[in-house]
Amino acid sequence: VSDANAGNAQPGVLGRPVASGLAVQTIKNPQSSARPVVFLDPGHGGVDEGTAGTTDTGEQVTEKAMTLSVALRTATILRADGYTVALSRVDDSLPGLPASAYTADGTMLTADGVLTDLQRRIDEANASGASVFLSMHFNAYSDPSVGGTQTFYDSTRSFGAENLRFATLIQNTVISAFHQQGYNVPDRGIADDTQLQAESLGTLPSSYDHLVVLGPGLPGRLRPTKMPGALCEGLFLSDPQEATIISQPAVQQLLAQAYADAIEKFLTTRPSQ
């Protein structure tokens, strides 16, 4: 979740509680093990709902449910095309965190706990040997008329140009998919993650104004991802129209297909190093 204008918090880490769960799963397609590994990061999970919205018919839609559904659908598409896919979670939970990550009553993550969970996602992406990282989220804003798709990247990394290329592919492919199906979703474009002015977490200094899952490392404090990546805010759940759209399984599949198409195009057109 990011603020529609400045985004003053890390996506998916607005101090909400989380629950422990299963470890990350990496599943290979045995027929084509030579293809690159893709890491998908569905935001939130367990009792951490992320943001939430209400459809035109009064149905509640949670970010954690939508990110998981879209991520699993994306993984299915990619695996069918021969890619190996790893995910940061595979059900409505989060992999286990130490007790110290939680508040005294165990119902919330501390700021350090949030950072620990984000570091877990980064470490799992690195351990998977992935060639690309996509973090999936949905947005919210106080004005319910605000909507659209936006994708973030980090320009300061050594592979910043590839981050930009990937974010551009994600954004353009998603917007095109929505528009082709008659959904007039606003194109909020791509943005460098420093434009979010994201709040620092745990032991990170206040000057660290990057999204943790995309940004550079800090010696002794943060280990960064080792591959190009982007974070996409698919729609605004605070907009009843967009909450209604994404509540439909067919639209979840549409978004998953767009993500998969962008990922495959990124990997198959990647410049030689």
Feature map (PLM): residue ranges:
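Active-site-proximal helix/loop segments of hydrolytic enzymes
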Residues: 2-20, 25-29, 61-273
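Short glycine-rich His-centered loop
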Residues: 35-60
